């Protein structure tokens, strides 16, 4: 490896002094000359670059010749060797520096260990309630609550101060604490009092301070299948199977019996998916035509109707209303239903078709088939309104509204 050391050139004013010193001290041994050619070598392994004495660059023949001659080269080589030694010492110090620094920091960390005191085994709600209950007046400010906690528990005396925010948040976010204003004109002040809410005593039941009401763990007893809910006494959690009840005159539907046989945890209602899928699907038209689903005309006795005046004159086409709109059905079914009406049934509010206005099938606006229209006994006001032009309160004809 070739090591080259660069030193600054000597000033021109110091040149003569160095020459004189070199000339006068030529008899003194030089550290380079003492080493000899064997230490540095003559092949230029460690050549000292020094400025020339005559103001220009002068090549040297060898380190041994310069030291033996006692010229200025020997004097300038001494600072170069010293600079090389300083550089080597700095490198050694830099190599040993990180390890020494780490050891020093480790010693400092070991000398001051971090110890955190144990936290008390209570929630912040319990600690605040404890402080308020131990007070003389039953109310404390935020600063007084903090002082109480610091005086009673060592955990709150350490360097950790985040517990103060927890105390403040628990005071303002829980319903079990109530703020009592010291000055009503300053509700935003921090010196207000805090006390326990008398309506939230359930949170402090059994000596345990809870955030919410404790849920009831026991469940209501399930009534036996043969007993009604109001007749079932208090039974254990798993009641034994009761004997089958005698058949009652009012028979229960099979759907209701299946619901009772289903487990108690299963949702049983008419809107449940099981009960919806259990019922067979029937279209609306089939439900309307099924026997027993529609009320036949004259099936039930009706009170006698009051006598009506004579038949009104034939109404125009606007007063004709479709019988299908009132549940009369299509004309084909009307004759079959009239045959079923007993002779004692009261007459309908339908006027017989006069000869001047025979029944004619008209095509309704909604249905595509033909409907049977006949004049009804409408009040005089409604007939008058249907005869004249539609006013501001009746913008459309009657058959358009009722069709």
Curated annotation (Swiss-Prot):
One BP annotation, GO: cell differentiation
Pfam families in the cross-refs: Forkhead
Tissues expressed in: Expressed predominantly in the stomach, trachea, bladder and salivary gland.
Organism listed in the record: Homo sapiens (Human)
Gene that specifies this protein: FOXQ1
DNA-binding region per Swiss-Prot/TrEMBL record: 119-214
Location of the region described as Disordered in the Swiss-Prot/TrEMBL record: 1-75, 94-116, 216-266
GO CC aspect terms: chromatin; nucleus
Keyword Lipid biosynthesis: no
Database matches in Gene3D superfamilies: Winged helix-like DNA-binding domain superfamily/Winged helix DNA-binding domain
GO molecular function: DNA-binding transcription factor activity, RNA polymerase II-specific; DNA-binding transcription repressor activity, RNA polymerase II-specific; RNA polymerase II cis-regulatory region sequence-specific DNA binding; sequence-specific double-stranded DNA binding
Chief localization: nucleus
Biased composition (Low complexity): 32-48
Protein's recorded name: Forkhead box protein Q1
